[in-house]
Structure formats: C-alpha cells, structure tokens
Amino acid sequence: MKALHKTSFWESLAIQRRVIGALLMREIITRYGRNNIGFLWLFVEPLLMTFVIVLMWKFLRADRYSTLNIVAFAITGYPMLMMWRNASKRAVGSISSNASLLYHRNVRVLDTILARMILEIAGATIAQIVIMAVLIAIGWIEMPADMFYMLMAWLLMAFFAIGLGLVICSIAFNFEPFGKIWGTLTFVMMPLSGAFFFVHNLPPKVQEYALMIPMVHGTEMFRAGYFGSDVITYENPWYIVLCNLVLLLFGLAMVSKFSKGVEPQ
C-alpha cells in the first residue's frame, strides 16, 4: 500500500492560497455578478457620509473655529471605520453561506471566513484609494504628508478587522442571536471609533478612555499620516499591534475549537 503523501508547510500554504482565491472569486461573482450597484456602494457610502459631515460643518459654521479641511477629515476616518465594521459583519454569515463547500477536503471553515473578510478589506481599500485620488485631482483635498505612515495605519487596521471578525464569527456561531445584535452594536461603536473626532479636542479625562479603544489609535495614525504637523495626534502603533495579536490568537483558537463541530450541508 502506498504511503499517503505528507504536504510540506509551503505546499499547504500554496493549497490554502488557491482555496481562498477560489472562494474570493465565488464571493465576487455571488455579490457583484448580477447587481453592480453592490460594487458601486463601496464608493457611494463613504461619499454620502462625507457629504453629510460637510453639510453639518457648514450648518454649524464650524469653519469659524477651525481651518481644517473637513472633506479630508471625513474621508480619512469613515472608510477605515467601514472596513472593520463591514468585515466583522460579513464574517458572521460566512459559514452558513459556504457550508456545502466544506465537503471538499481542502476547504476549511477558516478559509470561508477569511475569504469574506479579505473581500471587504480589499473593497474598502480600493474605495479609499479611488476616492482620495479623485478628490486630490479635483482640488478638494491636498496630497498626504506621509503616505507610508498612512499605509502602515491601514495595514494595522486591516489585521485588526480580521482578528475582530474571527472573534465575532466565533461568538455568533455559539450564540446565534449575537450575530443579529452585532450589526446594531457596530452602529453604537461608530461614534467611539475616532472617525468623527480628534483625541486632542477631548477633555483630558475623556482622552484616557478614548485611547483604550484600538480603533481610535488606527484613525489617529491614519490622520497623522495625512495631515502631518498640522494636527496633534496621540496614536500608539504598538498598542494596535498588541490588540491585533490578542484578537488574532483568540480568534484563531475560537475558530479552531468550533470548526470541529461544523458539518457540511
């Protein structure tokens, strides 16, 4: 009898890359293949939010107190919020939507979750780049002060979105009502994400609590890269790294635990 071929680490990695790639294509076709407005919404949602913030800024006549470009302020906060919010929300339904694919030997529960989150992160990234490029081209906002620092902030928050999504998906699998509640909780968390304020403008006691929230550090870091020395920010990249590691470790452990009880349908 022939001995079973044991795949090496690199072979296993290549297989997983192909599996996730195939799942990504399936998600793209399923979500955007028949209805292109779904793809367009990636750009429409942050633009609408920017428009609302600009209108509020003008209505409150806040330009009398600050010379900050409000369009740049909005567009450097909301798309990042949209990335982690949507990635974690989409992770919740990833298993039920792909349960039939688990019959395939190489498709794992983790792959189905990662594919959905990667698609959301990629979509938010494309939206951020395109919108900023257009706004710079038409002269509504200036070029970023430090694009590399912005990129580092975005990558850190992308890993945060993955870790958060793994944890939320695991909780929702074990406690189904939480999956429905999480959508509402993300709206409650929006004002706390740092997308609509600078930590520097908060009272000192409130600043301490705000800086306990990892999303605030990500937004502050992203805006520090865009505005440069024009604004005062309080980000700590190492705090985001620590939070990411904790979320990823807990998330992977939780997914590994409940995956054993998932049966193909």
UniProtKB/Swiss-Prot annotation:
It is a multi-pass membrane protein. InterPro entries: ABC2_TM (IPR013525), ABC2_TM_bact-type (IPR047817), ABC_2_transport (IPR000412). It comes from the Bacteria. Keywords: Capsule biogenesis/degradation, Cell inner membrane, Cell membrane, Membrane, Polysaccharide transport, Sugar transport, Transmembrane, Transmembrane helix, Transport. The chain crosses the membrane at residues 37-57, 67-84, 121-141, 148-168, 178-198, 238-258. It is found in: Cell inner membrane. GO terms for molecular function: ABC-type transporter activity. One of its GO terms (cellular component) is ATP-binding cassette (ABC) transporter complex. GO terms for biological process: lipopolysaccharide transport; polysaccharide transport. Pfam families: ABC2_membrane. Its main location: membrane. Residues 37-258 form the ABC transmembrane type-2 domain. Belongs to the ABC-2 integral membrane protein family. May form an ATP-driven capsule polysaccharide export apparatus, in association with the CtrB and CtrD proteins. This is Capsule polysaccharide export inner-membrane protein CtrC. The gene is ctrC.
